[in-house]
UniProtKB/Swiss-Prot annotation:
Residue ranges of the region described as Disordered: 1040-1077, 1147-1462
Organism whose genome encodes this protein: Pisum sativum (Garden pea)
Name listed for the protein in its UniProt record: DNA topoisomerase 2
Catalyzed reactions per annotation: ATP-dependent breakage, passage and rejoining of double-stranded DNA
Role summary: Control of topological states of DNA by transient breakage and subsequent rejoining of DNA strands. Topoisomerase II makes double-strand breaks.
Residues the record marks as site: Transition state stabilizer: 760
Cofactor: Mg(2+); Mn(2+); Ca(2+)
Keyword check for DNA-binding: yes
Active-site residue list: 761
Pfam families: DNA_gyraseB (PF00204), DNA_topoisoIV (PF00521), HATPase_c (PF02518), Toprim (PF01751), TOPRIM_C (PF16898)
Family, per entry: Belongs to the type II topoisomerase family.
PROSITE patterns per the UniProt record, alphabetical: TOPO_IIA (PS52040), TOPOISOMERASE_II (PS00177), TOPRIM (PS50880)
Binding site for ATP: 79, 108, 136-138, 149-156, 365-367
Gene Ontology CC: nucleus
Length: 1462
């Protein structure tokens, strides 16, 4: 057809055609010949790098072939292979390729094609399946087949593209042999020739002559023949030894698929220095795998039902993904910064896969890529663990690590610096000559922070700016040896240092000529953090440019003094280390006191003037680092490389305290820096609690400030807050014994404590059990650390049992990681008793307070399996009531959501729904499973499927013992290590107490003799010179008792007064005060000469003699008590406290159960589950707060004294028994002493009467509270407990001083109640018999707090109270109602939110006798709906004789409503 000139070839520009010419119908045969690429692939010649078989070996080379021709050969070959799946007895496959005759024949034995006429198609079956399109035996998809045929084309395509096609088959069952010839592209067929055969004959043979003209070829070319031969070898590899495969009469011998893969690997090894690995595995009957390594590009050879999938597919991905995931995790675990992805691992693998897949699907008729989904494979192939480990050991991990290093180096090169004179975009004070001709003379000073930069800038005024530059570091430099390339790339400090110095990545430096600076000076604080910064900088240079450290004077250090001593004569001495200072002080002896000492914590302590002084004497402060040998590099790696972890542990163990480098030396080699400076390391919350005497609650935020001040804590408030909160947490999985009380929201098991409130809103105080664990007598015996000349917290504490076993430990330190589970404190106590009694220890297993699951030993040494709790409600519904330790409720809820039907991105849901019925402390989750998943879940295991099991290991118990780090294999080893050290401290404690008692006896003896001497006139004190009096006292044999000098020990609880800070700042003694005669000083007799005049009486002498007798008896008892008995007594006391805690927790659980709201209806039809039972207690005990007494024996007596007073039992029902707790105070005075101090007359009879009245009032109040009915109103009495005279007001404004005492309300219409004495006569105290407690009518947990009752009473009118004025008494101290933070209204409002712990720990009233000077009563008033301002209750007090009426009125008129709210 002619086209119009310069026109397109669309239909409009071509001469018109007839309809018949435009729209044609082709037969299927014509269509195949017209569009062959749809069926057999391209019929054009392609050139591609492929594997071919020639000269008896596999060769990978460029091959020129026609894909269509290769495919028609492959179809016949796959047909023969399919017969193996239909008839496993097939054992022979023979292929003949004759290029000269252009003939190919394929023979296989086994069941032949049935020689029988098809009843529907009326032709013989061989003709049907080889000469009719779309015929197949594979159309029934309900039947799972592992054959290659699928679409009904196959051999017909070979017939169509052949000039001659001959089918021969022998059917032994029918005793017929069949032969038929097709020609002319299946267009012509001859009649079949059928002859007889033997019954043993079963075979099929196909011979064809390709129509080379269709493939634009003249003959069978060499490349095509080589491909065909390789395809025959494929069959031999897939069959292995089950089928004998012959090619052109030669048997191909392969025993397994591995032998076949070996042909490829032998060829690849020719260009390799080392042989390639061959990792082979056969998984079931359907999968055979072989793995080797590739050169950065993924390679695969794979087969599906003997079909060569040259482009892979889902079966290859299935195997490869398992291997890549495993190797990727291993590589990234070995080098966290590798950031290796799965595709990177894949590029280094060579995978061989031979598989049988049910009814396989491919991307096209050419069948180059399998597309069947993994779920439809018909079999699973989990790559064996042994094979994965062999792949890991094959060298692929090292290859990937090298690749990661190369990639990182390539990325880091992008941040290289250059030698330029002008530096831009960097926060550096650049030297004027940097990057220029004199750059080698320039020094870059790296300072620790901006404050140190200011000091360096002051020094530059001395040395000038031409050759000195300054750059401040923000915090510690990154440890580049263990950091990822992304971390290094994103680290601004590192990039700036590279730019300023002009460093180029991985460049070998033999000199500094190519750098912008010739020297790098480190100017850091002279403390452990400063040493670490220096080490990290050295590590940075050594990691990337180790050659630079060998350049002389490249790296230098600028040292500053840590202490400067100045003398009044203007002499100044500087010290660069603490040992140097200590040696100097020891040399000077007492004369050192004339020197003024200044500690330099950091460079910021130095003034600009001192900075200029430093730089004026630069040679004194500059130290050069030198490289001696490779030991220097090894030392740096030892300190910072993760690979050297084991060596670092040995290095740390060999450390000897007191080690330090010589600060006088001008040169420092790197190994000395690492081994003598960098190795030094340092450790304060419990100390602050003891020193603060934290027996009353304090806000955590305020406590943080106290701890920071008194323990020299330098690591940030947030870290300290986390530690304090962690010490107070008591939910399951946290502490078995919390050392601090959690008064507020300190976190729950919902989020593992992360849901705690801010430190600004929560309060804490010392737990009653803490001081039983850490005895006061040990405070003076511990070794205290020193910070800036101030003694701070102890180096370590000495509890009576190892606390690390009680609460466990987990963390990472320098060189070690450590994990120690929690253990039962009672089991630990029992084992300590066994050690004290010389018995064998009983093995201990992990134990967590409140945990209701199980902890069982596993087969692994030192391993335990932790299981939660799950119960079956019905066949479909289960209830989870406990999770494994440290698996938090919120996290578990997210897991359940990920397997719940209907949730987004859930592929295989296991449950229909779940419901949560628990609270902040209880786990209660109902799960409704999908019915079709129940069998699978139960088969695989309910605990495993729902992640209700975890493990605990005791194989990594590293701890610091008294000498340093040590590894323990069992908790019993820790106990055995602890025992002798603790026993030794009990011996020291006993000696210390006896020494104090002996000193006290001497003081008492001196006082008795002195007072008698003054009374009898033998010693005249008045109107005499001090020197004469000192001589007389010495001559009369009075023992000098020098005052103890100001202790360098910290002020711990009970050791010193709280005003110790004021004492430290006190003025030194004047000359008149420091009189000295014949070696005796005025202070030696201070106990005698400072006695008040009122004590110089015979009564005082008798009192002192009684006290002396008591102390002598105490001395005798203690000296005769074995050390082990002291420990046993402390253990008994500690166990009593544990009993009290258990009783409290049981009460909390009971309250929670009774107060809990009704649970939502569950999934099951069964009744709702009962609330969780309270924790099991081994023993009931009464709650007693700790006392600050002076010995173990006194503590035991205090426990007895603190028991509730006997209550006079009123008529009718007995009042319920009530635990009355006592607020812990130091040195509580008796009632008589307090009355005596205020000069108030008091008799025993009056005190007894008042005590009896108080007891009777409490009992009556309880009785009335239990009655229902609103006719009578309750009244409350506030008891204001007196603080000790020397107590310093705490931050909390003594909020805890208010306690409630129940009192029977007086009738409204009658007058005041009778005096206390009369009431006492009517209700005498009864004998101490235990009466059964009457049950309370109201529900648990609804008890009103003191604050709530006060608020109710305050809102009632003041008239007609009916309360006797005799009972309104004022406490003898400043009224607490004038304190802004202590308003009763505010406390009453706050009392509504009292936590359960606080509620249980606070008693209703003090159990000590109360005098009239201590009771304040607010009278009950008739209720009003809305009280008006004019009618508010006024506080009225009875006056003591020493107070004025005006003061009383002024105080009484201050209403709580006028107070400021805090």
């Amino acid at each position: 057809m002619e086209k119009r000139p310069l026109q397109t070839s669309n239909a409009a520009n071509i001469p018109s055609k007839t309809i018949e010419e435009m729209y044609q119908k082709k037969t299927q045969l014509e269509h195949i010949l017209l569009r062959p690429d749809t069926y057999v692939g391209s019929i054009e010649k392609h050139t591609q790098n492929l594997w071919v078989y020639e000269n008896d070996e596999m060769v990978h080379r460029a091959v020129s072939y026609v894909p269509g021709l290769y495919k028609i050969f492959d179809e016949i070959l796959v047909n023969a292979a399919d017969n193996k799946q239909r008839d496993p007895s097939m054992d022979s496959l023979k292929v003949t390729i004759d290029p000269e005759a252009n003939t190919v024949s394929v023979y296989n034995n086994g069941d032949g094609v049935p020689v029988e006429i098809h009843q529907e198609e009326k032709v013989y079956v061989p003709e049907l399946i080889f000469g009719h399109l779309l015929t197949s035996s594979n159309y029934d998809d309900n039947v799972k087949k592992t054959t290659g045929g699928r679409n009904g084309y196959g051999a017909k395509l070979t017939n169509i593209f052949s000039t001659e096609f001959i089918i021969e088959t022998a059917d032994g069952r029918r005793l017929k042999k069949y032969k038929q010839v097709f020609s002319n592209n299946m267009g012509t067929k001859c009649e079949p020739v059928i002859t007889k055969c033997k019954a043993s004959e079963n075979w099929t043979k196909v011979t064809f002559k390709p129509d080379l003209e269709k493939f634009k070829m003249a003959y069978l070319e060499e490349d095509v023949v080589a491909l065909m031969k390789k395809r025959v070898l494929d069959m031999a590899g897939c069959f292995g030894k089950t089928v004998k495969v012959e090619l052109n009469g030669t048997l191909i011998r392969f025993k397994s698929f591995r032998d076949y893969a070996d042909l490829f690997l032998k060829c690849a090894e020719k260009s390799k220095p080392m042989p390639l690995p061959r990792i082979h595995a056969k998984v079931g009957d359907r999968w055979e795998i072989c793995i080797s390594l590739s050169d950065g590009q993924f390679q695969q050879v794979s087969f599906v039902n003997s079909i060569a999938t040259i482009k892979g597919g889902t079966h290859v991905d299935y195997i490869t993904n398992q291997i890549t995931t495993y190797i990727m995790n291993k590589v990234n675990k070995k080098k966290k910064d590798a950031n290796v992805k799965a595709h990177t691992v894949k590029n280094h693998l060579w995978v061989f896969v031979n598989s049988l897949i049910d009814n396989p699907a491919f991307d096209s008729q050419t069948k180059e890529t399998l597309t069947t989904r993994q779920a439809s494979f018909g079999s699973k192939c989990d790559v064996p663990e042994s094979m994965l480990k062999d792949v890991e050991k094959s060298g692929i991990v090292d290859t990937l690590l090298s690749w990661a290093d190369f990639k990182q180096s390539k990325d880091l090169k992008k941040t290289d610096g250059t030698k330029t004179q002008r530096l831009r975009g960097c926060k550096a004070e650049d030297a004027n000559e940097a990057g220029g001709r004199n750059s080698e003379k320039c020094t870059l000073i790296l300072t620790e922070g901006d404050s140190a930069k200011a000091l360096a800038m002051a020094g530059l005024s001395v040395v000038g700016r031409d050759h000195y530059g300054v750059f401040p570091l923000r915090g510690k430099l990154l440890n580049v040896r263990e950091a990822s390339s992304k971390q290094i790339m994103d680290n601004e400090e590192i990039q700036n240092i590279k730019k300023i110095l002009g460093l180029q990545q991985n460049k070998e430096y033999t000199n500094v000529k190519s750098l912008r600076y010739g020297h790098l000076m480190i100017m850091a604080d002279q403390d452990h953090d400063g040493s670490h910064i220096k080490g990290l900088l050295i590590n940075f240079i050594h990691s990337f440019w180790p050659s630079l450290l060998k350049v002389p004077s490249f790296l230098v250090e600028f040292t500053t003094p840590v202490i400067r001593a100045s003398h009044p004569n203007k002499t100044i001495t500087s010290f660069y280390s603490m040992p140097e200072y200590e040696a100097w002080k020891e040399r000077l002896g007492n004369s050192a006191t004339s020197w003024k000492i200044k500690y330099y914590k950091g460079l910021g302590t130095s003034t600009p003037q001192e900075g200029r002084e430093y730089f004026s004497d630069l040679g004194r402060h500059r130290k050069d680092f030198i490289w001696d040998d490779e030991l220097d590099g090894n030392a740096i790696e030892l300190a910072f490389s993760k690979k050297k972890a084991e060596g670092r542990k040995i290095w740390m163990r060999n450390f000897e305290p007191g080690t330090c480098r010589d600060h006088e030396a001008k040169l420092i080699n790197y190994k000395d820096f690492v081994n003598k400076e960098l190795i030094l390391f340092s450790r304060a919350d419990l100390f602050g609690s003891f020193k603060k005497k934290l027996y009353k609650e304090i806000k955590v935020a305020q406590f943080i400030g106290y701890v920071s001040e008194h323990s020299a804590y330098h690591h940030g408030e947030q870290s300290l807050a986390s530690t304090i909160i962690g010490m107070a947490q008591d939910f399951v999985g946290s502490n078995n014994i919390n050392l601090l009380k959690p008064n507020g929201q300190f976190g729950t098991c919902n989020l593992g404590g992360k849901d705690h409130a801010s430190a600004r809103y929560i309060y804490t105080e010392l737990s009653p059990v803490t001081r039983c664990l850490f005895h006061e007598h040990d405070d003076k015996l511990l070794e205290y650390l020193n910070e800036d000349g101030k003694s701070i917290e102890p180096n370590w504490y000495m509890p009576i049992i190892p606390l690390v076993l009680v609460n466990g430990s987990e963390g990472i330190g320098t060189g070690w990681s450590s994990y120690i589970p929690n253990y039962n404190p009672r089991e630990i106590i029992a084992n300590v008793r066994r050690l004290l009694n010389g018995e064998e220890l009983v093995p201990m297993d992990p134990w967590y307070k409140g945990f209701r699951g199980t902890i069982e030993k596993s087969a692994k040494e030192g391993g335990y399996i932790v299981n939660g709790t799950v119960t079956e409600i019905d066949e479909q519904t289960f209830r989870i009531t406990e999770l494994p330790i440290r698996k938090w409720t919120q996290d578990y809820k997210q897991f359940l959501e990920s397997i719940t039907d209907g949730a987004p991105n859930v592929k295989d849901p296991l449950i229909e729904d779940f419901r949560q019925n628990g609270d902040d402390a209880i786990v209660d989750i109902e799960i409704k499973m999908k019915p079709e998943k129940i069998a699978t879940i139960l088969q695989e295991g309910l605990f495993k499927k729902f992640k209700l099991t975890s493990t605990i290991s005791t194989s990594n118990m590293h701890l610091f013992d008294a000498e340093g780090n040590k590894k323990f294999d069992t908790p019993e080893q820790i106990l055995e290590e602890f025992f002798p050290l603790r026993l030794d401290y009990y011996e020291k404690s006993k000696e210390y107490i006896l020494g104090n008692l002996n000193r006290l006896l001497l003081i008492l003896d001196n006082k008795v003799r002195f007072i008698l001497g003054v009374v009898n006139g033998e010693i005249i004190v008045s109107n005499r010179k001090k020197a004469e009096l000192l001589i007389e006292l010495k001559e009369k044999g009075f023992t000098p008792m020098p005052r103890k000098g100001k202790s360098t020990k910290p002020q711990v609880a009970g050791a010193n007064d709280d005003d110790s800070e004021e004492q430290e700042d006190a003025e030194p003694e004047t000359a008149s005060q420091s009189v000295s005669v014949e070696g005796a000083t005025w202070g030696d007799y201070d106990d005698l000469l400072s006695l008040p005049i009122g004590t110089l009486t015979l009564e005082s002498v008798q009192k002192l003699l009684d006290e002396k007798t008591e102390k002598e008896k105490e001395y005798e008892i203690l000296s005769g008590t074995p050390t082990t008995s002291l420990w046993l007594k402390d253990l008994d006391e500690f166990e009593k406290k544990l009993d009290e805690l258990d009783l409290k927790y049981a009460e909390d659980d009971r309250k929670r159960a009774s107060q809990g709201s009704k649970k939502a209806n569950g999934f099951a039809s069964k009744p709702a589950k009962k609330p969780p039972q309270p924790r099991k207690n081994t023993k009931k005990a009464k709650s007693v707060e700790p006392e600050n007494d002076n010995s173990s024996m006194e503590i035991e007596n205090a426990v007895e004294a603190a028991k509730p007073a006997e209550v006079a039992k009123p008529k009718g029902r007995a009042a319920p028994k009530k635990n009355i707790q006592k607020e812990p105070e130091d040195d509580i005075q008796s009632l008589q002493e307090r009355l005596a101090a205020y000069n108030i007359e008091s008799s025993g009879e009056k005190s007894q009467a008042m005590e009896s009245e108080e007891v009777q009032q409490k009992a009556a109040g309880k009785k009335q509270n239990n009655k229902r009915g609103g006719a009578k109103k309750k009244s409350s009495t506030i008891v204001l407990e007196s603080d000790s005279d020397n107590e310093v007001n705490d931050v909390d404004d003594d909020d805890d001083d208010f306690e409630e005492v129940q009192q029977k309300a007086a009738p409204v219409k009658k007058g005041g109640r009778k005096p206390a004495a009369q009431n006492a006569k009517k209700a005498p105290a009864k004998a101490p018999a235990k009466a059964p407690a009457a049950p309370k009518k109201r529900s648990v947990g609804t008890k009103q707090s003191a604050g709530q009752k006060l608020l109710t009473d305050m809102l009632q009118p003041a008239e007609g109270t009916g309360t006797s004025p005799e009972k309104k008494v004022r406490k003898m101290r400043e009224s607490p109602f004038n304190k802004k933070s202590g308003s009763i209204l505010g406390r009453a409002a706050a009392a509504k939110d009292i936590s359960p712990i606080a509620d249980c720990s606070a008693g209703s009233a003090s159990n000590t006798p109360l005098s009239e000077d201590e009771v304040v009563e607010i009278a009950p008033q008739p209720a009003r709906a809305r009280p008006q301002r004019a009618n508010r209750t006024q506080m009225k007090y009875a006056l003591s004789e020493s107070e004025s009426e005006e003061d009383s009125d002024e105080d009484a008129e201050l209403s709580d409503f006028e107070e400021d709210d805090d």
